[in-house]
C-alpha cells in the first residue's frame, strides 16, 4: 500500500511512475546470475532508463511477464529489502538476483531486478567464452599438471577442473588481478568469462577474458 502524505505528493508519485512494490511479500532472492546492460533510451522513466538483463549462459530469459526473450527490460534495481540501490549496477556487470513484476502507477506492471550481489567487470581484452565460477581447491601436487582449480558453469551444474587459470589475459589492471586472485581462494570463488585451452604438459588452462569483482551493495 502506498501512503499518501498529501495530494501534491500523490501527483508527484504518479508523475514518476511510483512503484507499488512486488506482487507478493518480500522473499529470499538471488536464485540466478544475470548480465546487466544500462538502458540508454531517453524516454520517460520508468518505461526507459532502467536495465536490460539476461540470464548468464542462457539463450533466453524468462521476463517479468512470463515470456521468454533474449533479454528483458527492468525499470529499476532494488536490494533484498526492496529498497532502491544507492548506486547503479555497472554497465556490462553481473548481478545475483531475481526478476520480479511490480505495479507502477499510471504505467502498469514492469520488471524489477531484486539484487543480492553486484559484480563489477574488469578487463579490456575482447570478451569471449562462457561465464564460470572458479575456485582454487588448495590441492597441491608433486608433479604437473595439477588440476587444482574447480570451474563451474554459472547458472548451471557443469563442472570441470583445470591445472591453471590465466587472469592476465583479461587485460585487467594489476590491482584488479590481485583482487581476483584473492577471490579464487574464497568459498564463493571468482566469477569470470573465458575459454579453455590445452597446455603442452597435458594440463588444461582457463583463460579469462573478463573478470567480475564483487562490489559493495549500499542502499539508500
Regions found by a protein language model. Give the residues of each.
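OB-fold and OB-like single-stranded nucleic-acid-recognition modules
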Residues: 26-220
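Bacterial N-terminal signal peptides
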Residues: 6-17
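Positively charged n-region of N-terminal signal peptides that target proteins for export
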Residues: 1-5
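C-terminal region of N-terminal signal peptides and the immediate post-cleavage residues
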Residues: 16-28
Amino acid at each position: 500500500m502506498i501512503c499518501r502524505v498529501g495530494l501534491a505528493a500523490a501527483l508527484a508519485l504518479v508523475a514518476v511512475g511510483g512503484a507499488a512494490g512486488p506482487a507478493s511479500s518480500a522473499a529470499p532472492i538471488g536464485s540466478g546470475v544475470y548480465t546487466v546492460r544500462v538502458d540508454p533510451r531517453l524516454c520517460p522513466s520508468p518505461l526507459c532508463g532502467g536495465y536490460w538483463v539476461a540470464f548468464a549462459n542462457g539463450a533466453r530469459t524468462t521476463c517479468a511477464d512470463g515470456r521468454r526473450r533474449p533479454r528483458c527490460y527492468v525499470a529499476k534495481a532494488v536490494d533484498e529489502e526492496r529498497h532502491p540501490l544507492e548506486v547503479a549496477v555497472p554497465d556490462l556487470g553481473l548481478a545475483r538476483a531475481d526478476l520480479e513484476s511490480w505495479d507502477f502507477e499510471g504505467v502498469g506492471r514492469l520488471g524489477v531486478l531484486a539484487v543480492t550481489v553486484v559484480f563489477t567487470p574488469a578487463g579490456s581484452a575482447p570478451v569471449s567464452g562462457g561465464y564460470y565460477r572458479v575456485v582454487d581447491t588448495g590441492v597441491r601436487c608433486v608433479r604437473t599438471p595439477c588440476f587444482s582449480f574447480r570451474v563451474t558453469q554459472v547458472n548451471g551444474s557443469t563442472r570441470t577442473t583445470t591445472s591453471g587459470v590465466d587472469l592476465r589475459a583479461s587485460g585487467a589492471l594489476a590491482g584488479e588481478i590481485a583482487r581476483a586472485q584473492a577471490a579464487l581462494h574464497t568459498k564463493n570463488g571468482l566469477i569470470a568469462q573465458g575459454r579453455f585451452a590445452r597446455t603442452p604438459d597435458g594440463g588444461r588452462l582457463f583463460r579469462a577474458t573478463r573478470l567480475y569483482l564483487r562490489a559493495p551493495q549500499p542502499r539508500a
